[in-house]
Amino acid sequence: MKYISTILVCAGLWPAATVCAQNGGEKDSTLNRTVVVENQYNPEVMDAFKVNVMPEVEEPAAPKQAINYATDLRPLGAWKATPMEAMSRELAQKGADRGYVRAAYGTLNNVDLKGSYLWDISSKDRLGIMASLYGLNGDIPHFMEGEEWKSRFYRTDVSLDYRHDFRKVALKLGGAFASQVFNYMPSMNEGVENWPTTQRYTLGEGYVGVVSRDKDLPIQFAFQTGLRSFSLRYDNYYMVYGSENIFHTEGFMAGNINEEQQVGVGLEMDNLIHDVSQQDYTLLQLNPYYTYQGESVKLRVGAHVDLQTAYGSGLKAAPDVKLEYTFADTYVAYLNVLGGTRLNDFRRLNDFSPYWTIAQQMHTSYTPLDAKIGLKASPVIGLGFELYGGYRITKNELFAVPGGFYTDKQNVFYTGILQDKGKVGYGGVSVSYAYRDWVDFSVNGTYYSWNVTEGNEGLLQLKPELKADFSVRAKVIKNCHALLNYNYERRQKKADLKRADAINNLSVGAEYELLNRINVFGRLNNLLNKAYATEAGYPVEGLHFMAGISCRF
């Protein structure tokens, strides 16, 4: 693995990138919302705030000609920084099934346990319960070529979501808890400063909200508020242990002008409070919009108006425009011109990489322009394709740098998170085909061109230049399917820096369904036994196997 040289080069970028981060704060894309259909239970939703508070924003989709598509979800890709993912298709509840359980185990002590149940207490009361555990404990490649290290990573999640329906509105209460324990990769340097080699993150949240349920009301609305907490148990090189607490509020109001037109406004507010060396501030995001939906044209015209009180305070604005045009029945041309502000809190950094560390507080990321144009089509039954291209500018974009600052003084490797102004242009194509439950395949490729401030090109070492993915699921015999996935990602090469090792992952698997509710599955991952680091900044597991069983009830 040639990656150690990349780490040392990137580590030297910390001082320069720190200066760049001080130039101001701002966002990327629209308000990040996960839309969940009101009466559909999704056992994969872990975040208590991922509920249907914001109005639904549909992505462009080519009209389907017939119902000959495969009915099952495609197999999931490999996890990045976390352990191998169980390959199961029961992510969507079928019919009246209320419960779901899954258990899988594999090499390197990969484990994946999950259970969920949706309980209709009465005709007006519903309770959703979910718990999961996943992780690994085994030897994986080290950045030092030929070496391995004992990696341990486990995460536990528990959530409760309750809803009571009144005549006009519904009351929602919920909460979630997560514990994430892991160790850092040792640096193998001698005579260095001794920092904790393990870490534990504790995440908690709770919310209360109301949402309109009478579709005859002139104004549809939803409002939700609650508290989110993220705590670090141990110090790292740059930050003492402590917590970040966020009072999070979101909601919307919308009304119909007529059957084709609607106006509305979305709101999201975060009040950040820290007991670590971070500055407190409030971010308020408003999203007024107008929508038109005709027979062949869909239009959304809006704006993101964001106000921040400190640490990059000021007023920022960005567009929120979407246009779709359907022609020849099955072709959709679309144009998106978006933007906005993104909060870079501890949760966001943890999603970026569990092994994250920061030399100074992250600014919010601001995207004044995120433009995309494309064409989606389904010219024949079962066949779909998309051509697309876009360009995005983000101030204070996040970049992962393996190793971090003063690598030679640390006894462990962190993944440093840095910020700089990032510009990326991209273009790609995707093709998919599905016929009944016999075969389902997809292939897609995207080319990226990234640019940052001159002198900070090393920040792009883990950014993709070319992504290519292929997946196929084919019936072998009745109720038995074989699966194959391939993921390739060539990294950016800038200036005289070496190109980081490419992501090169081939996986195969099989699954067998019993009694229309039990699924037995297995998968071999990283079949080529390649050694590379993901954007999370840590090496992946080598060749490994996982098998398990799941059941809907």
Question: How would you describe each model-predicted region?
Answer:
Residues 1-24, 331, 543, 549-553:
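Bacterial Sec-dependent N-terminal signal peptides
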Residues 21-91:
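N-terminal periplasmic/intermembrane-space "pro-region" immediately following the signal or transit peptide
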Residues 80-84, 92-101, 105-143, 151-158:
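Outer-membrane beta-barrel translocator/receptor signature
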Residues 96, 101, 298, 306-308, ...:
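Exposed, low-structure sequence patches enriched in small/polar residues
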Residues 115, 158-160, 206-210, 247-251, ...:
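Membrane-embedded beta-strands of outer-membrane beta-barrel proteins
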Residues 121-141, 258, 262-272, 277-308, ...:
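Surface-exposed extracellular loop regions of Gram-negative outer-membrane beta-barrel proteins
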Residues 136-157, 161, 171-218, 228-246:
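Flexible loop and strand-edge segments within Gram-negative outer membrane beta-barrel domains
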Residues 201-211, 222-295:
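Outer-membrane beta-barrel transmembrane domain signature of Gram-negative proteins
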